[in-house]
Amino acid sequence: MRMIRRAWQQLDHAMIRFMRANGIRALRVALGIVFVWFGALKVAGLSPVGDLVAGTVYWIDPRVFVPLLGIWEIAVGLGLLSGVAMRMVLLFFWLQMAGTFLVLVLRPELAFQRGNPLLLTTTGEFVIKNLVLIAAGLVIGSAIRPGAAERSDETRSGHA
């Protein structure tokens, strides 16, 4: 029994070391891939949320706004993937994330069933899931050390 407990503790410690060494980098890369992918779909005019974006930000021509939003998202994604200028990247990330919630304010009929904020539509679920992306941004941002150079070895390794 003692051997099993010791083996379990060693495995547990190894797993924790692995997650500490790679978790933030993996989160940054995964978030970067999502942003590049979603942005590329908008630029190509193939995004399934293009109409939603156009209908939410109705005061700007969607032929201009949707591709520009896509370029913005690609830039955020590339920044996350590279780990360069993370403070600026995260600023753009936060601005984009704030924009995703506009539909809840400007077009609530698209997000909520029968006007009830507890009853989400598919669109509402799509928007609310961005809370997970926000949490990911918080974790990535929490790893940036105050005053650290933007492109240090720590930033590239995911521990900045």
Residue ranges and their predicted role:
Residues 1-160:
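Membrane-interface extramembranous regions
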